[in-house]
């Protein structure tokens, strides 16, 4: 029993900046900071009633817990206790975690009602447990990974996927050490609607082709590639065609984009209706954009004149805010062709899923 409770301790925790006590608790959330040289791990039990739990490990290694925790213990007698937890969102930051501890924790969380998991600034070490025929981990809606390194390198996504139930809807991977996935090992993500690969400046268009394993994302609707080393809209289009994904929304903001003169034509996803090209340094409207869009964001670029209608796709909501040719940041104009220019389109203007609003919110249109 002590070993199982020790494993539960690993599940329920993270941090705010160095509070006097390891854990702070309010009605819904609990935050623990274990950066002290001799942390009081037992204080994490204060988080048992919280829905939103955060753990900050202070960069320490949890290798020693392998001798104290049975990651394969029978959880039968604790099932009702785990199910009764209010835990919905869990964040774990700044630690060195053996894969046996991580996947053992996911097995326990599989009994809970956890919906969102965030792992940040982690190093996952060692050999993982044998693969399972059926996932026993949590039924997550959202998984956020930022600066997480894995001992299994390119096989890490396939390995992690074995421990998650197949209902994942939103996956965010930032500052990844490898996005060159072993696609033959990756299973299909049958419910994934939003994939965010932002803040991976080394990814580039070639890397995007490797990351978007063909036929593994059949329900993908929204792809975010902010600050991801993209160079041309046409190059991204080619990567999407190779992956055979049918997007509705694409965010290419905060990349240094250029117009690829003479680039071969590309067939954009037929359902694409929202394209964000803000903060990309564009001096003119790039050629080869989709012929028709509901929303096109060209704000905060280097356009020195108002684009003429024949330079633009057929678009319902066009944002040009923050470009040099404007006298002010707020500008709207109706073209004879029916193009409407708006200073700052709201997220409600995008006819995408609620998942997009959940993950990207106002970041899709800056």
Swiss-Prot record:
InterPro entries recorded: Leu-rich_rpt, LRR_dom_sf, Monocyte_diff_Ag_CD14
Topology versus the membrane: Lipid-anchor; GPI-anchor
Expression (tissue specificity): Detected on peritoneal macrophages (at protein level). Cell surface expression detected in lung alveolar macrophages, dendritic macrophages and lung macrophages (at protein level).
LRR repeat residue numbers: 50-78, 79-114, 115-140, 141-168, 169-192, 193-220, 221-247, 248-272, 273-293, 294-315, 316-340
Cited Pfam families: LRR_1 (PF00560)
Keywords: Cell membrane, Disulfide bond, Glycoprotein, Golgi apparatus, GPI-anchor, Immunity, Inflammatory response, Innate immunity, Leucine-rich repeat, Lipoprotein, Membrane, Repeat, Secreted, Signal
Carbohydrate-modified residues: 33, 147, 180, 276, 317
GO biological process: cellular response to diacyl bacterial lipopeptide; cellular response to lipopolysaccharide; cellular response to lipoteichoic acid; cellular response to triacyl bacterial lipopeptide; inflammatory response; innate immune response; positive regulation of endocytosis; positive regulation of interleukin-8 production
Gene3D superfamilies: Ribonuclease Inhibitor (3.80.10.10)
Lipid attachment in record (GPI-anchor amidated asparagine): 336
Propeptide cleavage-removed residue intervals: 337-366
Subunit structure comment from the entry: Belongs to the lipopolysaccharide (LPS) receptor, a multi-protein complex containing at least CD14, LY96 and TLR4. Interacts with LPS-bound LPB. Interacts with LPAR1. Interacts with the TLR2:TLR6 or TLR2:TLR1 heterodimers; upon interaction with ligands such as diacylated lipopeptides and triacylated lipopeptides, respectively. Interacts with MYO18A. Interacts with FSTL1.
PANTHER family in alphabetical order: MONOCYTE DIFFERENTIATION ANTIGEN CD14
Name assigned to this protein: Monocyte differentiation antigen CD14
